[in-house]
Amino acid sequence: MRQLLTYMRDEKHIPPERLEFKDIKAETIAEFLLWLEKNGQISISTRNQRLAAIHSFYRYAQTEYPDNLLEMQRILSIPFKKKSRPTVNYLTKEEMKLLLEQPDVRNHKGRRDLALMAILYDTGARVQELIDLCVKDIRLHAPATVTLKGKGNKMRCVPIMGNTVQLVSRYMDDYNLKSNGRQQSPLFFNSRGEKLTRPGICYILNKYFKQAKKANPESILSDRIHPHMLRHAKAVHMLESGVNLIYIRDFLGHASVTTTEIYLKTETELKRSVLEKNYPDVVTQDIPEWRNDTDLLQWLNDFCR
């Protein structure tokens, strides 16, 4: 509301102490929102947040000042602006395979980097969830799982596959992470024994992505990589394999399945395969028998004259 008062003072030349309800109409609010977008260079989400605050104020005000009810209702009817969904960038199965082939597993660091990328993909973890992983969060014996701390400190337990278990186990042996007293240690750490940072993880991914792209320019179609692309890749690959969307929601730790639905829009072929699996082939190329009956068609034509 402070920004609205500033707008009324600077653009409408009405200081806050003289401002009355009659000075603010629905058109004024619409102009204010447009002014915010042009001068504040705010996103659609921020614009909608400002409008939500105005709506909240006017919902209260209409009960206290019913004389202005009509105009307040017009203000409350101002719609939120829709925003287009961002494109989901992800690695294909082939790209993911080529990326994981890059680390040199003949040395400790290469095995660490491979284990890190395998965990990031296999669990669909957010980069911060990976950073926060401790040794105690890994269960290597069957059923092998990783416990992730997501947004709002919500915990979720996700399975990891056999190949990933072997990679992580070998890495933990290399760095003596299975010994007593290491349970609270970060699973992945730098040379100082501290948690890896987001830029550090991005550096690791970019290093091997560039190697993979240089060695396989025709197979690596993506131009760049960031940690969230591995999370997107896991979700899309699960969907391609026919995994239920509700399970993918729980696997990724989404609060709503609406968020998970963005993966249904990733590519035309994926949407086509999902539709073909779930909908019967109603349309056929067969010509109904009555179309071949020329006498019947002639009778219908004569009847309609």
Model-found features: residue ranges?
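Conserved catalytic core of the tyrosine transesterase superfamily
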Residues: 1-305
